[in-house]
């Protein structure tokens, strides 16, 4: 058997048996075999966590732990920990097991809970203590040792959910994501986090009651600094011990699944923390990072970029994705900072980067890595979704790899977010001059499969909270928030909302304290806002017109996109059932319009089914309680006209009444409209 591979931009045919020779090992054990090592060094072992790191096993009739580590340029490696009083001992020296940098040792009689690190002697004579890159649990910060874990299994009861997930077409399903930071959603007190187990009691119930379909956890990989929010990782396989243990997180996810709530994990495969105990210069030389200093150094975030072309790094990262999918039943990955991975010149000035072999700024190995990641997940984990946080106009992010795409399922629509936030920050007087801020996103809407995000990044660093971005006094801010959200839920694309926005928290998000839940109890308007979001979420979930044809051009139609003078937008959302559609009338000024004509596509009886101006939401109560009757006559290029009342700073949603065996005359007789 032979393989064809690219080497120095030339095709080279090399027999597999010769390539395997350098990975050969004489070490006999139950944890890995030569095929495992071969695939690992080829960048195609997607379950490397099954043999890398620390694994309880029996060898020569002795129970203990086998440790396996990749450190290609280390001189010597010792395992140190509680069991050795943190001293290097000859009997705890790892053996180099092949030519390509794998080291391993079996140590008998080790027990769960023991803390350990690798003492790595470097070629220059220096030594450093490193946590286990594949370690699955760690000390609570500021301590940094890895911890042996054996009993990590739970009794899952989410088989029904997993079966449903595998059969679901998520492009034609409702996806409404609640993004949250576990350490600051709720707390016991100012200095004590809720544990995974404590969260499993209250979080699923809250998410279900509010009508969200998914939660998205900000990174739960181990990280030393709370203020990094989890985005500067030292332990990719180690779930953060801030909130409890491995079984606790599994129980939390299981509890969410039992309530039919999907779980998405924020994941950072592009760059890593430079703290000494982590992956940084692991064996004294660039190991997980690029060899070239300019390429490795991420000055913007003070981190190092992964060398995504290195096979062992690819095995490490793709296996990490499957570790959370397989072991924790994660339903999706939101891949952070994809733009940083795709572009060689991302965050770099002229002269600070080197073009690729074709003279471009594309990071070719990163592109290949992303494609392989998405292909692998689609192949081996049907129903698990991947989401790109990608902020540029890179094409085909959500197209299949076989057609030249990156293979993501969804992409955050950062353009929509920026334009619509800028619009809603304007005084309504000036909105007519920026009318296209809300219409332009539809010009490129079908270029990708978008998610509309209002994320944590928009409510920090002086940007103000979502409610505080809105223009006007207290009442108008809340009215504007309701209108903006209803417009968002009517716009094509799946939805994402950061915690705290759902009740109008005025202060920016702070990772060191819990949300201002007291607002709901103390202030009637915030309680009403909270109820509004609950109703809006369920309205979205229960009406297929709002999600079934998100990525089909037939799912959206403008009725009036050009009324800039009144800052009114009117559009239709459709479903596969041609008789079902919803008409959205969005008014972004505080003016009420009576006897306002809109065009509708069909003759019939219409009804207002949702109105953000309801008194129960804190609005002025300009609602329509009865039936409305269209009449023949062109309006907005539609054959029929409907006369309505348009509430101030609000969104109204209408539908045509379809009732079997009921004529229009009968509906007229029963009409109670006043």
From Swiss-Prot:
The EC designation for this entry is: 2.4.1.18
Instruction: Offer one Pfam family short name for this entry.
Output: Alpha-amylase_C
Broad class of enzyme this protein falls into: transferase
Question: What processes does the entry annotate via GO biological process terms?
Answer: glycogen biosynthetic process
Matching SUPFAM superfamilies: (Trans)glycosidases, E set domains, Glycosyl hydrolase domain
Q: Which reaction does it catalyse?
A: Transfers a segment of a (1->4)-alpha-D-glucan chain to a primary hydroxy group in a similar glucan chain
**Which residues does the entry assign to the active site, renumbered to this chain?**
336 (nucleophile), 389 (proton donor)
Transferase: is it a keyword of this entry? yes
Q: Name one GO cellular component term.
A: cytosol
GO MF annotations in UniProt = 1,4-alpha-glucan branching enzyme activity; cation binding; hydrolase activity, hydrolyzing O-glycosyl compounds
* Gene3D superfamilies tied to this protein: Glycosidases, Golgi alpha-mannosidase II, Immunoglobulins
The pathway entry for this protein reads as: Glycan biosynthesis; glycogen biosynthesis
Sorted alphabetically, the keyword list is: Carbohydrate metabolism, Glycogen biosynthesis, Glycogen metabolism, Glycosyltransferase, Transferase
Q: What does this protein do?
A: Catalyzes the formation of the alpha-1,6-glucosidic linkages in glycogen by scission of a 1,4-alpha-linked oligosaccharide from growing alpha-1,4-glucan chains and the subsequent attachment of the oligosaccharide to the alpha-1,6 position.
**Assembly and binders:** Monomer.
**NCBIfam families per the UniProt record, alphabetical:** branching_enzym, PRK05402.1, PRK12313.1
Family as reported in the entry's similarity comment:
Belongs to the glycosyl hydrolase 13 family. GlgB subfamily.
The name on file for this protein is 1,4-alpha-glucan branching enzyme GlgB 1
Source organism: Clostridium perfringens (strain 13 / Type A)
């Amino acid at each position: 058997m032979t393989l064809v591979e690219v080497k120095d931009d030339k095709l080279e045919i090399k027999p597999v048996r010769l390539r395997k020779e350098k990975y050969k090992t004489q070490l006999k054990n139950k944890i890995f075999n030569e095929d495992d090592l071969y695939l690992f060094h080829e960048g195609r072992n997607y379950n490397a966590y099954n043999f890398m790191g620390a694994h309880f096993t029996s060898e020569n009739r002795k129970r203990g732990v086998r440790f396996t580590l990749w450190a290609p340029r280390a001189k010597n490696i010792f395992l140190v920990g509680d069991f050795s009083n943190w001293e290097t001992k000859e009997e705890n020296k790892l053996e180099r097991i092949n030519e390509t940098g794998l080291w391993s040792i079996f140590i008998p009689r080790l027990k769960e809970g023991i803390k350990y690190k690798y003492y790595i002697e470097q070629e220059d004579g220096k030594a450093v203590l490193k946590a286990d890159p594949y370690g699955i649990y760690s000390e609570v910060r500021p301590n940094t040792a890895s911890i042996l874990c054996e009993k990590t299994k739970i009794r899952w009861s989410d088989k029904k959910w997993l079966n449903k997930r595998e059969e679901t077409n998520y492009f034609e399903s409702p996806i409404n994501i609640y993004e949250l930071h576990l350490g600051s959603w709720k707390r016991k007190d100012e200095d004590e986090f809720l544990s995974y187990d404590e969260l499993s009691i209250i979080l699923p119930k809250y998410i279900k009651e509010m009508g969200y379909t998914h939660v998205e956890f900000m990174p739960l990989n181990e990280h030393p600094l709370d203020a990094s929010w989890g985005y500067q990782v030292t332990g990719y396989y180690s779930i953060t011990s801030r909130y409890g243990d491995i079984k606790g997180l599994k129980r939390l996810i299981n509890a969410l699944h039992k309530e039919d709530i999907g779980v998405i994990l924020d994941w950072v495969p592009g760059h890593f923390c430079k703290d000494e105990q982590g992956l940084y210069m692991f064996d004294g030389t660039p190991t997980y990072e690029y060899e070239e200093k300019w390429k490795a150094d991420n000055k913007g975030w003070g981190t190092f970029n992964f060398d995504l072309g290195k096979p062992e790094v690819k095995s490490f990262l793709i296996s990490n994705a499957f570790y959370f999918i397989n072991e924790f039943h994660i339903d999706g990955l939101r891949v952070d900072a994809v733009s940083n991975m795709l572009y060689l010149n991302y965050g770099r000035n002229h002269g600070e980067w080197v073009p690729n072999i074709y003279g471009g700024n594309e990071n070719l190995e990163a592109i290949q890595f992303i494609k392989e990641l998405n292909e692998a997940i689609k192949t081996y984990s049907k129903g698990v979704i991947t989401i790109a946080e990608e902020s540029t106009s890179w094409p085909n992010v959500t197209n299949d790899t076989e057609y030249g795409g990156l293979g993501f399922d969804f992409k955050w629509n950062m353009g929509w977010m920026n334009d619509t936030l800028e619009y809603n920050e304007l005084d309504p007087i000036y909105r007519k001059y920026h009318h296209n801020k809300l219409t332009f996103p539809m010009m490129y809407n079908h270029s990708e499969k978008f998610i509309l995000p209002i994320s944590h990044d928009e409510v920090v660093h002086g940007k103000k909270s979502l409610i505080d971005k809105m223009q006007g006094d207290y009442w108008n801010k809340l009215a504007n928030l309701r209108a903006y959200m209803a417009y968002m839920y009517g716009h094509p694309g799946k939805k994402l909302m950061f915690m705290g926005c759902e009740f109008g928290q005025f202060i920016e998000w702070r990772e060191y304290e819990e949300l201002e839940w007291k607002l709901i109890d103390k202030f009637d308007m915030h309680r009403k806002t909270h109820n509004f979001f609950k109703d809006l979420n369920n309205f979205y979930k229960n009406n297929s017109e709002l999600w079934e044809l998100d990525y089909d051009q037939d799912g959206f139609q403008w009725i009036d996109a050009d009324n800039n003078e009144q800052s009114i937008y009117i559009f239709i959302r459709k479903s596969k059932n041609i008789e079902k559609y919803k008409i959205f009338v969005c008014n972004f000024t505080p003016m009420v319009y009576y006897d306002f004509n809109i065009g509708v596509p069909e003759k019939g009886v219409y009804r207002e089914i949702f109105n953000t101006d309801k008194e129960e939401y804190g609005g002025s109560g300009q609602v329509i309680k009865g039936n409305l009757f269209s009449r023949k006559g062109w309006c907005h290029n539609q054959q029929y006209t409907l006369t309505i009342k348009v509430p101030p700073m609000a969104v109204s949603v209408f539908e045509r009444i379809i009732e079997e065996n009921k004529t229009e005359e009968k509906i007229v007789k029963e009409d109670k409209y006043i």
